[in-house]
Amino acid sequence: TRDFNFVKDTCRGFLAIARAEGVEGEEINIASGTEVTMKQTLMKIAEIMDADINWVVDPERIRPSKSEVFRLCGDNTKIETLTDWRPEWSLEEGLRATVDWFRNPDNLAKYKYNVYNR
């Protein structure tokens, strides 16, 4: 499982930490606090895009078990205690906003797939 943040929530978290008093040197998570599997994420994207997909696992892409963190979910307790930050975007809202962004031809023309996907 993973814990995904929408980028606007992450940026708001950075700003909240930067503005907070007495947090220098603190390790502070910015997380949604919600676990989701990769399959659930893919199925939600397919639903948003109204796409019919087949789930295929490529054995070449499976990481060795000793190199993988199988469950990853952030704890927001510290950021919520030290700042007024709370996540505002659900996973579905963030995915919908992302899909909508990519559906806009003007945005897609600016997307540098050869730079971002190395």
Locations of regions flagged by a protein language model:
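C-terminal "lid/loop" region of Rossmann-like NAD(P)-dependent oxidoreductases
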Residues: G25-I28, K39-L42, D50-R71, N76, ...
